[in-house]
Amino acid sequence: MISGVFVSYRSAALAARAIATFREEARLAGREAEAIAVVNSGDAAEREALVPHADRVLLPPRNLGFAGGLNAGIAAARGGTFVLANPDLLFCRGSVAALAGAAEAGGLLAAGPALYADGARSVLLPPAEEARPEELARRALAADPARTARVFRREARRAAAQAERAAAGESAFVRGLSGAVVAVTRAALEAVGPFDEGYSLYYEENDWQRRLLVLGGRLVYAGGAHVVHLFAQSTRREPRSAAWFAESEARYYETHFGEAGKRGLARLASCAPFEAPPLPVAGGLSWVDPAPAAVAISPFRHFRPFALALVPHGESRWTPPADLVAAHAGETLFVRAFARASGATLAEARFAG
């Protein structure tokens, strides 16, 4: 049996859709499945809204955080394989089969999918980075206007490689997976241990994945598993999110990297706010260079991290998908068209949702 564990926080409608697509994909794969929903809001109405959709709905007496919610759901589940998930997901055709197959391939493994920001799967979310002090250094470089272009070119190469894997349905061993959805067997969970509930929100997946890697386990990017992630639909409305992120980040780096982690955090904190010329507001991008192009989409002016849209050959125009715009209503997104071969900027703008 495959157990889907969905941790919901003021996201009942999203979680219901996620559960429905998970169930359908498990059915098409010929796999027995169950869905466990953990309602972290403490809202009995949210629990009742999910009762028709999940096999079990847990309503803890307090907010357990994402880590605690996963642990509670895992403890209540019966499956030998788990899909541990955010509520703001849509499982695409073949995704549950591909994730389960990758997680069950033998050995100490965890698997994650190709994540898209839109239903048409034209905008690929960024590759996960292994959270190490070197990653803090890259974030500091990205915040430096004199060095940000070099960091962007590296990210563009990684994103393009991931897009090609996803398009071809290819899998690869990686050093980090998004925590939005991870597939893992019960045996692997028992070997690595539960998620650390000291993380209120954020970095719980990095901590768990690092423990798996230290034990000799491997992380699999399952390019044949495509999942739409509407991204931060509950946390972006939570005023404590920024504080939780800072607390979890400090805890993770200091726990796993000691003084090197502290130095990396201090360097990042000392960076001046990123400054660059303002971009014009536009509803799309156009450019004249005929070279193969891609578009980066980011909430940050320095474009780190960014989602990637590959522009079809021969086209020199791009408009954001309507569902991406709707998911980020009220936010500003920065967009950059760039030459895929060189990373050179072709056009830039900002979208004010």
Give the positions of each predicted feature:
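Active-site-adjacent helix/loop segment of glycosyltransferases
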Residues: Q209-A282
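Short, well-formed alpha-helical segments that are part of the catalytic scaffolds
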Residues: S11-A26
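Short, flexible, basic/aromatic active-site loop/helix in glycosyltransferases
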Residues: E130-V174
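Glycine-rich, basic loop-to-helix element that forms the pyrophosphate-binding segment
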Residues: P60-A77
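Short aromatic/hydrophobic "clamp" motif used to bind/position activated sugar donors
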Residues: F82
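Acidic donor-binding segment of Leloir-type glycosyltransferases
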Residues: F22-R62
